A protein has these predicted regions:
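Bacterial lipoprotein signal-peptidase II cleavage site
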Residues: 19-31
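Mature extracytoplasmic/periplasmic domains
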Residues: 293-362
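Conserved C-terminal helix/tail region of periplasmic/extracytoplasmic solute-binding proteins
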Residues: 354-390
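Early extracytoplasmic/lumenal segment of secretory-pathway proteins
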Residues: 33-111
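A ligand-binding cleft/hinge motif common to bilobed small-molecule-binding domains
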Residues: 107-112, 258-273
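Extracytoplasmic ligand-binding site segments that recognize negatively charged/polar headgroups
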Residues: 61-63, 102-252
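Periplasmic-binding protein-like
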Residues: 126-130, 225-233, 271-294
């Protein structure tokens, strides 16, 4: 959905692609975490390609520019179903009609825990190698109990965006959107999704350490209550709860002057007044990965697709089309245009992404490793969200 799609087309397309999209960079490795999941064997060898592969994907991930060449090379016809939300992706994958999904972190754990996807044999995916950026390997959202379930596609941070005409001094903290005395009260943009609760948790991790939050997606009942209380206070200062199709106009129209955003949306304003920063407290973010259905009807074509789209050239095409950092860092060396894109999205800057907690599905087994308490689930977050907005 980018390169760079005109507004409002870009924002509308982005809405389909990221509404609910992919968590954890900072401290969110799956190392040592054990969660009970269905025992599904992974493929040991590849066979002959089937005639097709059926894919559920965000808009912009499966396009003729690269899908047609894949079909010519493999004989696998690509059948695409565009999904608008992670919830829709989960529902579609549970029908058994699709082989692959471009899952985000707020969907992937649901698919893994419920046995909807199978672990992957990365030896059968040659392009899943050293060129895949380290920060997109072994993360909670697609790796569990030592098994890889997802082949990374791309990532991005939820940055703090601001209008330099109004916010004259570059902010370095999320305090400008959370504290009651913010000079920008009434002009603050907030993301309209239950997963935004994690943004409040990130701020509380830094400002109220006594709450004991170690992972913004692992909140017990009291920690969730604290995050919801902060969100309710913020509600009094919010100008708009945005989705990707309204974010750009909220800023360009002057309704909002500061708030959470995505780098691709900032660029979509085509206005240098709007700048961004990754605040000192860190941030949430999103990351997407290909996942294979537990009972895929076309697994060989699916493996071929995962390998093909993990090459530097094709992964880079997807990243530029969508507006995100590519998973294959080798893309950044292919051309001046590729390098510029990678620089814009901090593609290979692991120090940058070490401060980002990529979206992950909150589940009752605490993702921070605690055993003495039950954590809140995404259903709990979904139930709490309407109380925030009033």
């Amino acid at each position: 959905m980018k390169k760079y799609l005109a507004i409002p087309a870009a924002a509308a397309a982005l809405g389909l692609a990221l509404a609910g999209c992919s968590t954890g960079g900072t401290g969110a490795s799956s190392d040592g975490l054990q969660i009970d999941v269905p025992d599904i064997p992974k493929m040991e060898t590849l066979g002959d390609n089937e005639k097709q592969v059926n894919i559920v994907a965000w808009s912009g991930f499966v396009e003729p520019a690269w899908a047609d060449k894949f079909t010519a090379e493999t004989g696998c016809t690509v059948n695409r179903k565009v999904a608008a939300t992670s919830d829709e992706m989960v529902q579609l994958m549970r029908t058994g009609e699709y082989d692959l999904v471009s899952a985000s972190g707020d969907a992937s754990l649901r698919l893994i825990v419920d046995g909807n996807v199978q672990p992957l044999n990365t030896d059968l995916i040659p392009n899943f190698g050293d060129d895949i950026v380290e920060g997109m390997k072994g993360q909670l959202y697609d790796t569990l109990n030592g098994n890889v379930y997802g082949i990374p596609i791309g990532r991005g941070a939820n940055i703090l965006q601001y209008n330099t005409d109004v916010v004259s001094e570059k902010p370095n903290s999320w305090s400008v959107v959370w504290e009651k005395d913010s000079p920008y009260a009434g002009k603050i943009a907030a993301y309209d999704s239950p997963i935004y609760i994690a943004d409040a948790a990130v701020y509380l991790m830094a400002t109220q350490p006594e709450l004991g939050i170690k992972n913004p997606y692992a909140l017990d009942k009291d920690q969730l209550a604290a995050a919801v209380d902060l969100l309710k206070e913020q509600n009094k200062m919010v100008s708009e709860y945005w989705n990707p199709s309204t974010n750009v106009t909220s800023f360009t129209g002057g309704n909002s002057v500061v708030g959470t955003s995505w780098e691709v949306l900032r660029k979509a304003t085509q206005d240098e007044r709007f700048q961004s920063v990754l605040p000192k407290e860190g941030a949430t973010g999103w990351s997407d990965a290909w996942m294979l259905a537990a009972e895929a009807k076309n697994p060989n074509c699916a493996y071929a697709w995962m390998d093909y789209t993990s090459s530097p050239q094709v992964n880079g095409q997807i990243a530029m089309n969508f507006g995100m950092a590519p998973a294959n860092g080798a893309f950044c060396d292919l051309s001046a245009e590729a390098k510029a894109h990678c620089d814009d999205y901090s593609a290979t800057d692991e120090d940058y992404y070490s401060k980002v907690w990529f979206w992950t599905t909150p589940i009752e087994p605490c993702l921070d490793g605690r055993k003495d308490v039950k954590c809140t689930s995404y259903q709990d977050w979904t139930a709490a969200w309407p109380t925030v907005k009033g």
